[in-house]
Amino acid sequence: MRHVDAGSCNGCEHELSAASGPHYDLARFGLSVTASPRHADVLLVTGPVTVHMRDALLAAYEAMPEPRIVAALGNCALGRGVLGSPDNLAGPLEKLLPVTVRIPGCPPTPEQIIQGLEPLLHRSARQGASKVRGLEDPSALR
């Protein structure tokens, strides 16, 4: 996964960090965050897309190998947030990129993040994505 903060308040990043920590451990589900979009099959976007982050976000998407999966994490990425004014925003994420997975919340909990990513893990495996593996035991979250 490549995470791009497109202009958030960092609430979603805090929860994503918790989901990656030892208690939830995203890695046990085959998920890891990579520094380069060239090594990612999931683009995880947080925050509303600001004017200043638009080009960087689109460049990250273009650098990803096929199949490209975009996940919107949090209400701001879904166009329902309270940050910014229309003049500061490039538009809703869904108008800029094809969003596959929507994970609502302000911010979503680590459990919601993992459960929200579960469907795309199975889809990714069916499409032959190489880096994301299926969630073997979703009940492990409970």
What are these regions (language model features)?
Residues 2-142:
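Iron-sulfur-associated redox domains of electron-transfer enzymes in respiratory
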